[in-house]
Amino acid sequence: MITQSVAWWCFVPEKLTPDRFVRAAADAGYPAIDLVPPEYWSLVSEHGLAISAIAAHQPLTIGLNRFDQHDRLEKEIRDNIIHAQRLGIRNLICFSGNREGLDDAKGIEITAAGLVRVAQVAEEAGVTLVLELLNSKVDHPDYQADHTRWGLRVCQLVSSPRVKLLYDIYHMQIMEGDIIRTIRTVHGMIGHYHTAGNPGRNELDEAQELYYPAILQAIKETGYAGCIAHEFVPKGDPIASLQTAFQQCAPYL
C-alpha cells in the first residue's frame, strides 16, 4: 500500500507552528511526516504519526562525492541509522554534494564508494539509504546528482537492496522531464518519492504543468509500496493545502 506524507520544512516555521502543523497533518489523514528535525521527533510520535524520512547527513552541498568527507559522513550516517531503526524510520536521505569541478564519472565512483561503507549496516538495520536527485538548474546550482542516470549508476555500483534513489518528481521535471517513462523504467531502484508543482514548487494544482493523477497511477502500477512525500510550499492557506493534497492524491494510490 502506498502512503502519503508531507515535508516539515515546507510548513514550519513560516506557515505554521510545529504543534499546529503536526496536528493539521494528522487531521488531514497523513500517517507520516518527512524530514522532521530531531528536536521534534517526540512531538510527531505523540500525535501518533510516523516519520517517513530524515536526512542521513548534512549539508547537501558537501556530500558523498568527496573522499575527504567519507569518514565524517560514515559516522553521521551510522548514527542516523541507529536513530532510524529505533524510531521505525524507513528512509535516510543521502546527498551527492556539489560538483566543484568534479567530472561525473569520478563523482559517481566516489559517491558509490562512500555508500558501500554504510550499505551493510543499513541492510542489517532494515533502513534504506536513498540518494536524492535534485535540480541544479533552479534550486541547487552545481549539485551533482542532478539526473536519474547519475543516481542510477551509483546504485548499480553499490549493488545493495538498501541503497536506492529518492526520485523527486519536481526536480527531475526541471532537469529531464519524461517522468512517467522514467518511473516505469527504473522503479526498482526507487525507494522514496517527493512531489511538488512545477514551476514554483507549490501545490499540485492546475496552475502547474505536472499531471499528478497519471504520475501517481504510474507509480502504483509499478507495485511500489512505500511513501510519497509532498514537498511543496503552499501559496494559500497551509491547512487547506495539506488537506487538498491528501484528498487529491488518495484516489490514485
Write out the residue ranges for each language-model feature.
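N-terminal small/glycine-rich loop or linker at the start of catalytic domains
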Residues: 1-10, 51-65, 97-99
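Histidine-acidic metal/acid-base catalytic patches
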Residues: 1-27, 34, 88-90, 145-167, ...
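Feature marks short, surface-exposed loop/turn motifs that line or immediately flank catalytic pockets
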Residues: 12, 39, 57-61, 98-100, ...
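Anion (oxyanion) recognition and catalysis
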Residues: 26, 45, 85, 119, ...
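A short beta-strand-loop structural module common to alpha/beta enzyme folds
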Residues: 31-39
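Active-site-adjacent beta->alpha loops and helix N-cap segments on the catalytic face
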Residues: 39-49
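Hydrophobic residues in well-ordered beta-strands that form the structural core
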Residues: 51-53, 131, 167, 230
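Active-site acidic/histidine proton-transfer and metal-coordination neighborhood
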Residues: 63-164, 174
